[in-house]
Amino acid sequence: MKVRPSVRRICEKCRVIRRHGRVMVICPANPKHKQRQG
């Protein structure tokens, strides 16, 4: 899980979602693409 000031999709499979007021990127294809805005 990377924590960065601005999150963006790295590949086509990445999905930008909102959980508990936080913007996150989840990726079923490549778990290394997981990010959270912080």
From Swiss-Prot:
- Keyword vocabulary terms for this entry: Ribonucleoprotein, Ribosomal protein
Would you name any one GO CC term?
ribosome
* Coiled-coil region list: none
The record's annotation in PROSITE patterns points to: RIBOSOMAL_L36
**Per its UniProt entry, which superkingdom is the organism in?**
Bacteria
One GO process term, biological-process aspect? translation
Please give the InterPro entries that the UniProt record associates with this protein.
Ribosomal_bL36, Ribosomal_bL36_sp
**What are the recorded GO MF terms, alphabetically?**
structural constituent of ribosome
Q: Say which family it is in.
A: Belongs to the bacterial ribosomal protein bL36 family.
Q: Which NCBIfam families match?
A: rpmJ_bact (TIGR01022)
Q: What is this protein called?
A: Large ribosomal subunit protein bL36
